[in-house]
Amino acid sequence: MVEPAGTALVGVAVWGQNLYNSWRPRKVGIYGAAMVGKTTLDRYMTTPGEMEEIPDEERTGHMRLLGKYLLPKPTRKRISWKGDRRVVFSADLGGQERFWSLWIDDMVARQVEVVVYMFDERAFKGGDEALQQIAGFKYLVDCIINRQYRYRTLKSRWKGKKYVPRLIMLVANKADRFFDENAAMLWQQNRIGEHKVFDPFRDDLVRLQKAGVPSRRSFMATRIGWNVETTLIDLLST
């Protein structure tokens, strides 16, 4: 028989943990190649709702100063889903190859605890777009494993020497374009990591595991708001 006092203490502890998770600011880095949905996710986290297809001319870019691209400042978002809440600070970074070094600068300078790498169905269709998405993840993994960080300040250099993100989340975005019967079955069985959409990234996921960096996988469809809040709240509860 469970003692009432013990039950009450457990309830208070759970309530306290939920309250802590609801208000603690979480630093999240959202990276990925061009046109995979990073800006859509950034806008959706800021204000959920019906999202437009972002035109090419509005793709994220960055100004240069003295030969360096300027890092955008992170903005605060508040994510809510069925009573759970999280406060997230993230920045919208470009996905073109010339901006990849900014991912690392942002990650190290802010000491992000969770990295979300986004890709879409083009990654397993071949061609230049697939190569960019796969190469972007490999670049990110190389930098994390080998700690090939660039430091913009002495403070970031001091912090970066021992820095490794707590978790890497590989997100297959635009799931509405590839979610088939097999995906539905794997989803129900909590085995989505076995879906073929993740095949191009498996070697680098293994490298992360061997290096002691945990990784997870998920589906999203940011433009229609499917599985966005669920994924992020679950990610920030671990």
State what each model feature region is.
Residues R26-E52:
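Glycine-rich phosphate-binding P-loop
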Residues V114, F119-Q209:
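Conserved C-terminal guanine-recognition region of P-loop GTPase G domains, centered on the G4
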